[in-house]
């Protein structure tokens, strides 16, 4: 049997309508936070998406007249805070919310501020390459602006000590997180510029969330970096963390350790450069000596090939000139070597590698001594060969023959007389002796009879 009072019977349409009215009147407007997913925007301009958290989700719609007041483009995975009305879509019985307003929540809001400041400073030209200052090469003093207790400072000092232990470092401690951090960072940058002790600054901190790194997205910090006369290397967080300070800085390093690598020089590389320079100097000296020796050999060969009585004086003069040129060239070479040594010594003194500098100086002095001794020995040998050549030439000279008591007689036509049949009585003859000439007239001609007969 049916009870005396029958329960109300709803049609599906009436049920959905009743539930919709209950939701709209009883709940009113609510604030909801969640993560956006399945975001779509059809041609109508309306937005359709899902808000979800770890355990639930709800369908959302935001009509065109509402979403055009939103100042950012919603992205998949973005956390937002919405003001909405709860309703039911009667044809399908789907429960949904109608969003009236939307704003980023948490990091979403920070991300929006980040993009707005980035666009503003970029429009002002603070990111332009023309304002980027070159880093000093090499750096003579490095300033570090970071927390004195953070891991970033430890990493920077560790790298600098390993790569360039003689490089001075000045630390400007400052907070890198919290409400007071931007002001302290700005004052540290201004202090470094006032003291003018450093020629490059590292500004940064270790990794963290967007909120942790937010001090380096502050407009005051960005403008202080841009106004710094000292080149600034930003080193904020990890390689994937990009802040406004990175865009304004003269150079962005992906990590604090990388920043220390950038501003320092590798001491081992410097020593290799010194070794390479020394080898080039030795090769230049060897080439110079070989070239001078070859030139001297050529001159000596030409001296031997020419007639000594005609070329002796000129070759001697040329030899003296060559000797002077060689001495002058040697002095210049030694002077340049000394100047190069002084430059290398100054560069090495800046890095304080004293033991290697001392060995390099000793090596150069030895080379200079060897070079001077080699040239002296060659010049001595040359003089000895030259004296021997003069002695030999004097020995075979016709003048030496005259000195031994011989003479040379010529006719009036200048021909040397070898037989009596070349002259006649009454002719005038000229005789060359060691100390002069004698003219004589032929009075008598008397041939010498041959003492031997020819054998047939």
UniProtKB/Swiss-Prot annotation:
EC id: 3.1.11.6
Keywords of this entry: Cytoplasm, Exonuclease, Hydrolase, Nuclease
Catalytic activity field: Exonucleolytic cleavage in either 5'- to 3'- or 3'- to 5'-direction to yield nucleoside 5'-phosphates
Enzyme class per UniProt: hydrolase
Record's keyword annotation contains DNA-binding: no
Pfam family membership, one: Exonuc_VII_L
Disulfide partners: none
GO terms for biological process, alphabetical: DNA catabolic process
GO CC terms: cytoplasm; exodeoxyribonuclease VII complex
Source species, domain of life: Bacteria
Cell location: Cytoplasm
GO molecular function, one term: exodeoxyribonuclease VII activity
The UniProt record lists the keyword Cytoplasm: yes
Subunit (UniProt): Heterooligomer composed of large and small subunits.
HAMAP family: Exonuc_7_L (MF_00378)
NCBIfam families: xseA
Function: Bidirectionally degrades single-stranded DNA into large acid-insoluble oligonucleotides, which are then degraded further into small acid-soluble oligonucleotides.
Protein name: Exodeoxyribonuclease 7 large subunit
Source lineage: Bacteria, Pseudomonadati, Pseudomonadota, Gammaproteobacteria, Enterobacterales
Gene transcribed to yield this protein: xseA
